[in-house]
Structures are given as C-alpha cells and as structure tokens.
Amino acid sequence: MKGADAEARAAAWLASLGREVVARNYRIPGGEIDLVSRDGDVLVFTEVRQRHSSRFGTAAESVTPRKLALMRRAALAYLSREHGREDLPCRLEVLTIDGPADRGTLTLLPLDG
C-alpha cells in the first residue's frame, strides 16, 4: 500500500501547513484527484507522486501530460458536482515524495492553468 502511505503522509503535511483536506481519491471515469484541500478560500487539487528511487526517474518526472489533462478534467468535475459551478478559485499542484513514503523528501510543485 505504498501509494496509500504516500497520500496519508502528503495529507498530514498539507494539514500541517494549515490546509483543510476536504476529499481524498476523488474519482470520475477516466480521472482522479488524490487530495482536495482548502487553502483559505482556494480549493487545491493535489496529485501525489512517490518514487522510492530515481532509477526510473524522479517522482515529478512520472507526471505525464496525459495525467495532467485527466487531473484537470477531474478537478472541473469536482467543482461542478460538489459546488455547482466551475469558476471557483482553485489551483492544481503535484506533491512529490522522492524516497520512501514515510521519510522521503517532499516537494510541492504548483501547476499552471
């Protein structure tokens, strides 16, 4: 359950930054958001990626353009279904953990539009 461990650590870390985690593993057909949190009035959609070693690339390098497109689609669905509109203040980000899920280095990477 390496992915679940990484997501649990990521959620705890985001909470330590003052965020309220409001959803985990939000799924639609063909897309998923690992964590949805509130940072003040802004909803933040976070993809969590963890790599134990960089032998096959870093955690950040594992996020493909296709994954980003699916993430955007899932974020729009969340806004529409959970809040009835798509124009709320929000942002997307990737939280990477390079190394073991329980002690690897965490990095937060904001995404554009």
UniProtKB/Swiss-Prot annotation:
InterPro entries on file: Restrct_endonuc-II-like, tRNA_endonuc-like_dom_sf, UPF0102_YraN-like
Signal peptide positions on this chain: none
A molecular function (GO) term: nucleic acid binding
UniProt cross-references to Pfam families, sorted A to Z: UPF0102 (PF02021)
Gene3D superfamilies reported in the protein's UniProt record: 3.40.1350.10
Recorded family membership: Belongs to the UPF0102 family.
Annotated HAMAP family: UPF0102
Protein name (database record): UPF0102 protein Dgeo_1894
Organism, as annotated: Deinococcus geothermalis (strain DSM 11300 / CIP 105573 / AG-3a)
